[in-house]
Design a protein with these regions (language model features):
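Thiol-based oxidoreductase modules, predominantly thioredoxin-like and allied folds used
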Residues: 313-328, 338-349
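Alpha-helical adaptor scaffolds
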Residues: 101-155
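Short pre-active-site segment immediately N-terminal to redox-active cysteine/selenocysteine motifs
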Residues: 282-284, 289-292, 362
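Thiol/disulfide oxidoreductase modules built on the thioredoxin-like
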Residues: 298, 334-338, 345-390
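N-proximal helix/coil linker or "cap" segments that precede and/or mark the start of modular domains
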Residues: 193-269, 277-280, 331-334
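Conserved helix-turn-beta segment immediately C-terminal to the redox Cys motif
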Residues: 300-320
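Conserved redox-active cysteine motifs that mediate thiol-disulfide chemistry
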Residues: 288-305
Length: 400
């Protein structure tokens, strides 16, 4: 998954395609039709901005488009949400409100969010649609999400065919919240501004104080439980609960800052075998990228600059490429002057063995690994990334 227009939507929502029980088609009530029309009207007005974002070639261009989108969103969404709520409040007990309430919960107004979550809890706590709504926000960082998932998890009315989803989502939620303090510390100026704008400065201050060790320990326990109980349950086609649990457990146990980076053994884009440990003694920036990922390609110019800047110093850029068709990559490499080596993830692309083992759920994903092979940074971008690299390159030079 690539970065989108706001931090809250750059996080994995793996249940969007999960199979739901098929229900007979029922004509929606008039209020639900009106709410859907309000939503479609806003989306239509923002569509040109989304297209501009997809076409942007540099991080600076994307930052400008994000800034523009936030200004437009501030104009369009609040009145649209209020119009929708005037239709939804009187009908809150009707299951047909779930889709509309789920949409309104994207509001950045904490009071409105809590009102919506309160209505969902009161009337539709364990409906499949509400469970999917909560599961898809498991990694969103919203203040209410952990409480909602815990309430669903503990409910005696939780349907058996939905239990796996809540179990997995709660594990994901706790893992994500455990990572937030480090992620905020490494956030670029652009991402930091977006975090403040999406969640509010008070909420971001709370996130920075999360007890990462406690949250991580509980998430690890939940991942082990759900992986053992529902190993073959399909989350989306080609991805099972067992696979997700295994990747997440591996990330928690082996991919934290301060831990030795696991070995990667694979082939580069020319088919030659190599290992991550081949670069021991140098600081490594490990970049998970793909040509289908706009933000990944937007980073290429800066990555070229880093390669040139550190040419005579102990630094190496190593990629992990997620394109399923290696043959088409030759033109991409030549056009973008990509000279550094990349592991190829295989013909399954982002679901290949390396990205799956490293639990990569957002593209690009960047690691800074020091000369001793220890992970020193995850997901840093912009000036923060540059500072991390310079810090550890200097330390590597000092040891020589």
């Amino acid at each position: 998954m690539i970065r989108s227009l706001a931090v809250s939507f750059a996080l994995l929502a793996p249940f969007a395609c999960a199979d739901e029980p098929k229900k007979p088609e029922v004509k929606p009530p008039a209020f639900a039709v009106e709410v859907a029309a309000i939503q479609q009207d806003v989306q239509k007005k923002l569509e040109p901005i989304y297209k501009d974002f997809d076409a942007a070639k540099t991080e600076r261009e994307r930052d400008a488009i994000v800034a523009k989108s936030l200004v437009e969103a501030d104009k369009l969404y609040p009145p649209a949400y209020e119009r929708a709520m005037k239709l939804l409040r009187p009908n809150a007990a009707d299951p047909a409100t779930i889709a509309g309430l789920s949409w309104v919960c994207n509001s950045r107004d904490p009071a409105l969010q809590m009102e919506v979550v309160g209505l969902l809890r009161r009337h539709h706590l364990v409906y499949p649609e509400t469970i999917t709504f909560a599961a898809n926000r498991a990694r969103s960082g919203n203040a209410w999400i952990q409480g909602l998932l815990r309430e669903q998890f503990a409910s005696p009315d939780l349907p058996e065919d939905q239990a796996w989803k809540v179990h997995l989502a709660l594990a994901m939620c706790l893992q994500s919240q455990a990572q937030l303090p480090a992620r905020l510390a490494d956030a670029s100026e652009s991402d930091a501004r977006q975090f403040d704008r999406v969640f509010g400065k008070e909420r971001v201050a709370e996130m920075k104080k999360f007890d990462s060790a406690k949250l991580e320990l509980e998430s690890l326990k939940l991942f082990k439980e759900v992986g053992e109980k529902y190993p073959k349950q399909v989350v989306i086609p080609g991805l099972t609960v067992g696979q997700m649990a295994t990747s997440s457990i591996f990330e928690i146990e082996h991919l934290g800052v301060g831990k030795v980076a696991p070995e990667i053994v694979g082939e580069d884009l020319d088919g030659a075998k190599f290992k991550l440990s081949d670069y021991r003694g140098q600081v490594v920036m490990l970049s998970f990228w793909a040509s289908w990922c706009g933000p990944c390609m937007g980073l290429i110019p800066h990555e070229r600059e880093l390669v040139a800047k550190y040419k005579a110093r102990p630094f190496t850029l190593v990629g992990v490429n997620g394109d399923p068709d290696k043959k088409e990559l030759k033109a991409v490499l030549e056009t973008n002057k990509i000279t550094w080596r990349s592991f190829w993830a295989g013909d399954k692309g982002p679901e290949g063995p390396i990205p799956m083992t490293w639990n990569v759920n957002m593209w690009p994903t960047l690691y800074v690994i020091d000369a001793e092979g220890v992970i020193r940074s995850k997901m840093a971008l912009g000036a923060t990334l540059d500072a991390r690299i310079e810090e550890w390159v200097k330390k590597a030079e000092a040891k020589k």
